[in-house]
UniProtKB/Swiss-Prot annotation:
Keywords: Apoptosis, ATP-binding, Cell cycle, Cell division, Cytoplasm, Cytoskeleton, Endoplasmic reticulum, Exocytosis, Kinase, Magnesium, Metal-binding, Mitosis, Neurogenesis, Nucleotide-binding, Phosphoprotein, Serine/threonine-protein kinase, Transferase, Ubl conjugation. Activated by phosphorylation on Thr-175 by STK11/LKB1. Residues 411-429 have a biased composition (Low complexity). ATP binds at L26, G27, K28, G29, Q30, T31, G32, L33, V34, K49. The KEN box motif is required for interaction with FZR1/CDH1 and essential for APC(CDH1)-mediated ubiquitination. Residues 432-446 have a biased composition (Pro residues). The gene is Brsk2. Its cofactor is Mg(2+). InterPro entries: BRSK1_2-like_UBA, Kinase-like_dom_sf, Prot_kinase_dom, Protein_kinase_ATP_BS, Ser/Thr_kinase_AS. Serine/threonine-protein kinase that plays a key role in polarization of neurons and axonogenesis, cell cycle progress and insulin secretion. Phosphorylates CDK16, CDC25C, MAPT/TAU, PAK1 and WEE1. Following phosphorylation and activation by STK11/LKB1, acts as a key regulator of polarization of cortical neurons, probably by mediating phosphorylation of microtubule-associated proteins such as MAPT/TAU at 'Thr-504' and 'Ser-554'. Detected in pancreas islets and in brain (at protein level). Detected in brain and pancreas. Its main location: cytoplasm. Residues 346-476, 492-516, 682-735 are annotated as: Disordered. This is Serine/threonine-protein kinase BRSK2.
């Protein structure tokens, strides 16, 4: 990795992997840290996954190599692309496609359950990409909304092929992996299984989640959850279209032999859709000419290494025998697919490199001398047209640059074993900025991460490498976590709260100061959540004490809403629906501020006040409905609720002041007391706040029951079998 900067105070540093400048941290996965990379010339954005070779076991590194080989096999518009691979002795860098829309999981949390039309769009794209993978004998085995990303146009990208496997012919898979919420019964039971059938089950669970906003199988107790999955009994909500219900039952089928195939799914009436909808995506043809390989010298070494890392071709002698066979077979098809990818996208040394001055910089994993289609070896590409620098940062003549390259500065490492001492990818000596083609230095964008390496006593930089994604440095603990994660996958990812890292966490290059990022998957921070959502309500001819009392009145009349007082004119509230699963239900947190619009302080008894509602976190749609309910009470011409409303909202309450100590006291008197408290506070008297009511009304302005949230949706019972639940009566279709 290269670090460039300017001497003197306020120096800015930039870390590079090849031509890509590293910026903010996007997330932390199971095997490495993921950072945003920007090309120093084209400004292309990529996601760079940094894998620490020294802190991961050999089996985990083999999984990373297998993921690289699988991503080379797949070229599909709805599969995340692998651009390049860089490496040095200590680190491996995967340069992946960057998408800005975030995870489908976060989209579902923010928007709630989707309309059948939007769900069909996403589902078609998932099936199209999965069909392409299966046609190349690749099974994903870890499909879930967290691993489905969205680009800027809300199109799907399937990501994270770390659990993927190559299933050749009629062979079956044995490894139990994935998340238990999306895993099929045969995987849960530990039986041999067909990876293609397992992916179909996972797609059925995902489709159910898109349409319902909840999972068909859910339980806080893992043992109970696994039993539910093995039984395969789930509740089918009434609002799902009948055609889609039959599709879901065919995909979420316990008997793998009766489970629908991708071919049947693509012919299903719901998948095809109506006349006014676009046609389903057609399969992408990919024809590769399979020819005979006369001898071992005709076999490309890079392709052979990639096939060996796939896992199912570990017997190298048998693989070579199959490749040299005159008959067409699966091995030859995969070989020529990888060879075709290598010939169409050759990996050569970079030419647009920034200045670098390191002992062991990241080197691009380039192609070895390979055979062309005519059986002749291509000359090895030796491009040395890159500006080199001395220790002081001055340019080096071209001849000396070539000499430095001959001493290992730009070795073509294929296996990853490179000479020289290990250097952290996150620190290196200062050098001058690399000039752009026009002669001016490249501007450093605002917000570029700054990292200043500490000086050792000898005056050499002390590298601070990123910590390993594994827990601790104990080998047995690493192995234990690997075994656990291989089966459970990410069982809590579907329950995690959407966390936005602080600016310090985003700019820091080491994950030690970013513990919250470890809870997110690789690409969980692609989506931009910095935009604030505010709603303003203007109130005239009401004193401040009355407005504050009305706000508290509205808070207490909404079931499952709690609040706290921040200051004289500010409140913080949280709406959290009770009785439903926490899968896609996120609490709404917001702040309420009261400001006087005609002066600095509210000194007048009556005037014009502005009440500002600011969304802090949670679904915006539910936030708007909560605010609409509060706004209706604030703008009401009557200070007191109607008699009918009072009869519906009468509760047993106690107030700390002792003014209300008997059950059955009307709520109107209760809020008169609140107004009096605020009035006393304004006059300088010590006010005592009433305690929270011990019981909330079962009827409120948001719905017919406490279980109905601002969205008007009846929540599913938590921890109860979905099969025992009757059809939701209060749930209504989305607009």
């Amino acid at each position: 990795m290269t670090s460039t900067g300017k001497d003197g105070g306020g120096a800015q540093h930039a870390q590079y992997v090849g031509p890509y400048r590293l910026e903010k941290t996007l997330g932390k996965g199971q095997t490495g840290l993921v950072k945003l990379g920007i090309h120093c010339v084209t400004c292309q954005k990529v996601a760079i996954k940094i894998v620490n070779r020294e802190k991961l076991s050999e089996s985990v590194l083999m999984k990373v190599e297998r993921e690289i080989a699988i991503l080379k096999l797949i070229e599909h518009p709805h599969v995340l692309k692998l651009h390049d691979v860089y490496e040095n002795k200590k680190y491996l860098y995967l340069v992946l496609e960057h998408v800005s829309g975030g995870e489908l999981f976060d989209y579902l949390v923010k928007k709630g359950r989707l309309t059948p039309k939007e769900a069909r769009k996403f589902f078609r794209q998932i099936i199209s990409a999965l069909d392409f993978c299966h046609s190349h004998s690749i099974c994903h085995r870890d499909l879930k909304p967290e691993n489905l990303l969205l680009d800027e146009r809300n199109n799907i990208r399937i990501a994270d092929f770390g659990m993927a496997s190559l299933q050749v012919g009629d062979s079956l898979l044995e490894t139990s992996c994935g998340s238990p919420h999306y895993a099929c019964p045969e995987v849960i039971r530990g039986e041999k299984y067909d990876g293609r059938k397992a992916d179909v089950w996972s797609c059925g669970v995902i489709l159910f989640a898109l349409l319902v906003g909840a999972l068909p199988f859910d339980d806080d107790n893992l043992r109970q959850l696994l039993e539910k999955v093995k039984r395969g009994v789930f509740h089918m909500p009434h609002f799902i279209p009948p055609d889609c219900q039959s599709l879901l039952r065919g995909m979420i089928e316990v008997d793998a032999a009766r489970r629908l195939t991708l071919e049947h799914i693509q012919k299903h009436i719901w998948y095809i859709g109506g006349k006014n909808e676009p046609e389903p995506e057609q399969p992408i043809p990919r024809k590769v000419q399979i020819r005979s390989l006369p001898s071992l010298e005709d076999i490309d070494p890079d392709v052979l290494d990639s096939m060996h890392s796939l896992g199912c071709f570990r017997d190298r002698n048998k693989l070579l025998q199959d490749l040299l066979s005159e008959e067409e077979n699966q091995e030859k098809m995969i070989y020529f697919l990888l060879l075709d990818r290598k010939e169409r996208y050759p990996s050569h040394e970079d030419e647009d490199l920034p200045p670098r001055n390191e002992i062991d910089p990241p080197r691009k994993r380039v192609d070895s001398p390979m055979l062309n289609r005519h059986g002749k070896r291509r000359p090895e590409r030796k491009s040395m047209e890159v500006l080199s620098v001395t220790d002081g940062g001055s340019p080096v003549p071209a001849r000396r640059a070539i000499e430095m390259a001959q001493h290992g500065q730009r070795s073509r490492s294929i296996s990853g074993a490179s000479s020289g001492l290990s250097t952290s990818p996150l620190s290196s000596p200062r050098v001058t900025p690399h000039p752009s083609p026009r002669g001016s230095p490249l501007p450093t964008p605002k917000g570029t991460p700054v990292h200043t390496p500490k000086e050792s006593p000898a005056g050499t930089p002390n590298p601070t490498p990123p910590s390993s994604p594994s827990v601790g440095g104990v080998p047995w603990r690493t192995r234990l976590n690997s075994i656990k994660n291989s089966f459970l996958g990410s069982p809590r990812f579907h329950r995690r709260k959407l966390q936005v890292p602080t600016p310090e966490e985003m700019s820091n290059l080491t994950p030690e100061s970013s513990p919250e990022l470890a809870k997110k998957s690789w690409f969980g921070n692609f989506i931009n959540l910095e935009k604030e959502e505010q709603i303003f309500v203007v109130i005239k001819d009401k004193p401040l004490s009355s407005i504050k009392a009305d706000i508290v009145h509205a808070f207490l009349s909404i079931p499952s809403l709690s609040h706290s007082v921040i200051s004289q004119t500010s409140f913080r509230a949280e709406y959290k629906a009770t009785g439903g699963p926490a899968v896609f239900q996120k609490p709404v947190k917001f702040q309420v501020d009261i400001t006087y619009t005609e002066g600095g302080e509210a000194q007048k008894e009556n005037g014009i006040y502005s009440v500002t509602f600011t969304l802090l976190s949670g679904p915006s749609r539910r936030f708007k409905r909560v605010v609409e309910t509060i706004q209706a009470q604030l703008l009401s011409t009557h200070d007191q609720p109607s008699a009918q409303h009072l009869s519906d909202t009468t509760n047993c309450m106690e107030v700390m002041t002792g003014r209300l100590s008997k059950c059955g006291t009307p709520l109107s008197n209760f809020f008169d007391v609140i107004k009096q408290l605020f009035s006393d506070e304004k006059n300088g008297q010590a006010a005592q706040a009433p305690s929270t009511p011990a019981k909330r009304s079962a009827h409120g302005p948001l719905g017919d029951s406490a279980a109905a949230g601002p969205g008007g949706d009846t929540e599913y019972p938590m921890g109860k079998d979905m099969a025992k639940m009757g059809p939701p009566a209060a749930r209504r279709e989305q607009p």
